[in-house]
């Protein structure tokens, strides 16, 4: 059977490379060769970082949903960094924390620019295929996601661009290199359109508001250049945007409902109690459902959403009135408490209105550090913050689920807010884990987690450099009109246009996370939000946290492990560990402790009982230090001979106690005084030229008795 081969070869006639620079480094876009079945795709090359970006839209809208089903996935392949996954299957598993956080960072600026009425599934995928540590794959992925969506036929009001900003020696640096990031006081990511800022994410070492705003402005200048580059590609190969099927509520029906029931909604919502408000809305919705039987469950949910949104926004814009009656710059009632849970190492509870978070702090040894298996160069993490949002916190009767993207994002925000004030590892070598349990949620739980973490850390005796507090600022816009309000609650977050979260100390900002539902913010709005959050943060620090616990406790909890550190010569590490780990395992078992020996000779010993840790330190010292003549040791009898007993004073170090030096009185037989396995005190009397150690139990007993007598006399 003959096999015929076609003479035609794929020439990729539509393939083209577009080139520019981003923050001084080459930036290339390859289109027309790969992923031909996506709506649009591009391979982004930033330095030697390569990210494959794709966007796909379903041909038909998804039925039965009242939201736009957008899915943004950032994938890290370990082959990009020349590594094999450490899992049993040696295959990448579920997305790691860094990948989830990057997916959120790309999702948040892109989502507001899609039509809210669209119900077609849209999936944006960014796959890191090669990693250059000096060229951020997150920024390459964000720009690539923006580019492919803008080029595709999918309706979208982009493009956007993104830039990272560092602050090195007081100078603003765009897209800092790996070495610059290590020295930077700022890790800021900004996304923007040509005119407005659409996303801000930051961790900072107490940076002031003016410097932060200048960094955002510097980022925007570079972003405008990349947007101009994207627009040139869109002009050349962009596809016409398709019309989509609008799935939603009949607006004539909605206007009729609004005219009839507006006063009822206003009366129901005029309360500061979320439960009362929700209960008052139920009979109104029952009446509407009875009057309009053709409305589906999704339609009724949309009616409720639109009516509440209309009331909240009109009250704010027309009357300056908030749902709970507060002033625009007024914070809800606050409370703080520490030492709530007796057996945990530290605990703190922070309450803001109907939002309440209980945070615990647990201390562990260096071996409790979290192992990282992603593309980052950081292999372990010593400070961990976890955020849990159980259903009961919002009054829902359902089983709890494992943490999702929201929980991971909120936990990371609180984690970044506290990292700048943690003590150096040399000063405080513990692993620190904070867990924030949301007990009740009515907005700003992530900021309550920051405050709760400060309380728990100080209650645990962690010597933080300064207390940290967090607060959020909201926004309502209508055309050119806008209004910001401090400390937004749930209904204002849900129906407002912005949730601007800022954590920091008295000195400056340590973390920012900005979410918006509109097409962007002006510098004036950002500056006002910064100032309101600064004043609110100082109030919480001075009036709420300081009176409860002004500084970290001077002693750790009695239940916390006690940790000691020491340095040993690197050539002695093998002696401490022993063959197959036998020596170190014996020390851990005997002293009931944990020991971590690092490559540079640092040894960390932790134990709940301080005396156990000290015994382990002493044992390690006896191993690495040569025995001193005149020093007294506690050793174990290993062998009995006619002429004496051999005693191990440290692993691998054995000496002889001659029968004449076994006791203060004459000894006829060695076994009359000691047996194999006995623990006895001995004194080093001599070390000969061959390194053999001579010991005396008699001299040790006499020396200890003399010391005791001296103490009794003195």
Question: What residue spans do the PLM features occupy?
Answer:
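Long, basic N-terminal domains or extensions that often function
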Residues: 2-245
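Glycine-rich, flexible beta-strand/loop modules in the N-terminal catalytic cores of phosphate-handling
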Residues: 38-122, 128-130, 135, 201, ...
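Conserved phosphate/anionic-ligand binding catalytic regions in large, soluble enzymes, centered on
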Residues: 40-43, 135-153, 338-361, 442-462, ...
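Conserved helix-loop functional segments at active or binding sites
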Residues: 108-116, 151, 340, 365, ...
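Single-stranded RNA-binding regions, centering on S1/OB-family and related RNA-binding modules
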Residues: 559-565, 570-714
